[in-house]
């Protein structure tokens, strides 16, 4: 406990706190203490393993970073902590291996990563018991049991009398996060390709395999979960040799859960995966100059942007002044950054004074926003001349939706937290938009529905802000005939092409040609479910491209399906009808002409912009009936009748009426002339009619959230 006493000296703005529990009776200055606790809480959280791994790889006590769980008592000691850092100069490229783990979802990536951390003494077995899937740090990853963010970790391992630095990157397996995988491969020279011994080669296994081949990575095939009763190692081995083209003697059969045969993995990594090599030097470049690739970043409350970098060439140390190539290219007056902190992830932040060629680590240099820290950018010393590294292909969103704060007063907060979240997820695109029903928000592009759902969950869990996400849609291509508009060359274009991702931008012109995006889908399934899958794909307007039997029981089916037919429940239905055995991978396949229409929802003839949909003409009626029936249950009864309608153009195709509350105005009439009752009823009728003309229907904010879900809806609370 700290007891406080107000000082009466000449410094009126300072308050001193005396620690009764401290043997020396140390006095803390409040201003210094506040700053120390902020900085040291981060240091303590990020460096609790520092002494453990340094002892394990043979560093002396003098070389070890002090344990940050013992808090220093003044600013001078904090500086001493910062000076005490790991020396990585002994790990030249020949003693470095950079690799990632790739696989289909739930094929054992995170479990194998846990084993490697334990085998290299990066973390203890006791700590791992309470923290399975150690590298899955996000709450959403823990709850869903999936990897969302690629995580890196530096491991030290002694092999044949030599110490090696192994940089591991654990990647996601779901197709919605394939951009994370491709980014991670940019910092790697090899990959561990995992295949579940009970499920065999799946759709995302193939997708990741081809990504690794494109990056020229050395691939080590590994069969996982061989200890399970459902394991079929012989059949899966045939799959791997036949589909992936690997040799049987190359496959390492392991159980990461029990550790069976896992001791073969690290030697294979050291022997088979090549050491990192510098890029070729172009004419005019400064020889040996720093080339550092940013392949991930996140926001720290106290230090700003933290960039995860791969040192492709040269070295960087604390105090260096660096430029960002993207900043230099796009700014008339580029910003010069000074490196303030460097380190490696082991698995948390461990400081070092310098990073060398081939190494992976974090870098802090005073960047503050997403515009400054661009994924795929090249960092270099300010006075050198270099050619930038290739970087990454920008992810193209497949699904769009509007995101609005549940509380409209929290728009500024939503803008700030989205900006911070974009540092860790650059595949999301945003654009400000306004809705009459929901207020001001953002139009966001995602790689898939799971990606969108995870993004919303992270907003709620990491930044405590509740949001409304509108119905997802895709990008449509609109082609209209030009009526005489001239270009800058004074010529008339034959047609005008534009792309829209918001239903409210859908053209009213009936002569406009609409093209919808298509997707090439690869479905891997057991043979017994082929018939059901064909029916599902036909219902979603799919066209079969190819079907191949890899074995007596395994089938690969390729379909071209409109992307709009896949973004709702296609994957869920596929999993349900195949008992979870079928897997799906897809990629964009251009645009095709389609008869799609805009579905407008109206309440008492007033359109609700947030409830517009774009659907195929053949399904417009069924969608309209579903929407009006769901709205009828969600909207509370009013004092006047509410007409809920869905229209395509000027034609109403579905309608429901929500009856008004009715007061018994004749309750006080006891017998007498019937004309008195009629007069009261006519007066009430006229009042209701006038109220309907002047009144407006309010849709509760939380009703939008329920409406955009696919579950059953209970009737609205009529007590309001």
Curated annotation (Swiss-Prot):
Its EC number is 3.6.5.-. It is an enzyme of class 3 (hydrolase). It catalyses: GTP + H2O = GDP + phosphate + H(+). The keyword Magnesium does not apply. Keywords: GTP-binding, Hydrolase, Membrane, Mitochondrion, Mitochondrion inner membrane, Nucleotide-binding, Protein biosynthesis. GO terms for molecular function: GTP binding; GTPase activity; mitochondrial ribosome binding. One of its GO terms (biological process) is translation. It comes from the Eukaryota. Its main location: mitochondrion. GTP binds at residues 103-110, 170-174, 224-227. It is found in: Mitochondrion inner membrane. InterPro entries: EF-4, EFG_III/V, EFG_V-like, EFTu-like_2, G_TR_CS, LepA_C_sf, LepA_CTD, LepA_IV. Residues 94-277 form the tr-type G domain. It is a peripheral membrane protein. This protein may be expected to contain an N-terminal transit peptide but none has been predicted. Belongs to the TRAFAC class translation factor GTPase superfamily. Classic translation factor GTPase family. LepA subfamily. Promotes mitochondrial protein synthesis. May act as a fidelity factor of the translation reaction, by catalyzing a one-codon backward translocation of tRNAs on improperly translocated ribosomes. Binds to mitochondrial ribosomes in a GTP-dependent manner. This is Translation factor GUF1 homolog, mitochondrial.
